[in-house]
Amino acid sequence: MLACLACAPAMADETVSIGGSRAVLINPKAPRASVILMPGADGNIRPGDQGDIHGLTGNQLVRTRHAYAARGLAVLVVDAGTDLTSAVQYMAAIKRPVTVIGTSLGTIRAAQGIARGARPDALVLTSGFLSMESGSSQNVMSILGSPSSLPRTLVIHHSQDSCRATLPAGVEPFVKWSAGRARAVWVSGGLNEGDPCQAGGHHGFNGLDGQVVGIAAGFH
C-alpha cells in the first residue's frame, strides 16, 4: 500500500503571486488543461505561505479544488483581488486550454474580469448571477452588455436553488442572450441545509460535489 502511494505523482499545493495578489496553485504532473477557480461570497480565500487556504473553506470550489487536480487539471484558486487577465496568462503558460470556473458571486467577478479584457478559452458559471431574472440587478449580462466577449460557456445550476440572487429562472434568459455561446446543465438532489445562499444549500451543491466537478472538469 505504501509503495503504491509512493508511486502516485505528487501534487503539492503552493502559494504563488499573480500581479501582487496571492493565489493557490495545484499543478499535477503533465496536466491536460488548466482551471481557475473563483469562489463566491467575498472571494477572500486568505492563502497561507504553503498553499494552505484559511478562508471560504466550505465554498464549493474551494472544497473541491483537489478533485479537479485529481482529474489531471492544473488548478489555480484565486483571491478576490487577483487580476483575471494575469491569472489566465499565468495558467496559459502551464497548460492551455484555460477554463475559468466561478460560483455564486464569483460569477460576477469572472464577468468583471472578462469585461476588463481577460480571455479564457472557456467559462463555467455555477449557481450564477446570470440575468435580471436570477434576482439581482448586477449580473453577468449587465456587466458584459453584449455576448461578444463571452467565451464558450457552460452554466451548471441546481433546479431547486432558492438563493434570491441566483434563481433558476435566470438561466434560460442568459442562454438565449448568449447567441449560442452558452449551454446549461441542470442538477438536482443532494442536501439543502442552512442559509439558501450558502455552501450547505442546493446553491452550494451540497452532496453533489463529484457530479458537479465531473461536469465542469469535462468542459474545456
Where would I find each of the regions flagged by the language model?
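A fold-wide structural signal in alpha/beta-hydrolase
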Residues: 34, 69-76
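Alpha/beta-hydrolase active-site loop
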Residues: 59-64, 77-95, 112
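Residue in the alpha/beta-hydrolase core beta-strand immediately N-terminal to the catalytic nucleophile
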Residues: 97-100, 122-124
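Gly/Ala-rich beta-loop-alpha elbow adjacent to hydrolase catalytic centers
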Residues: 101-110
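The feature captures the conserved acid-bearing segment of alpha/beta-hydrolase catalytic domains
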Residues: 127-189
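C-terminal catalytic histidine-bearing segment of alpha/beta-hydrolase fold enzymes
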Residues: 181-220
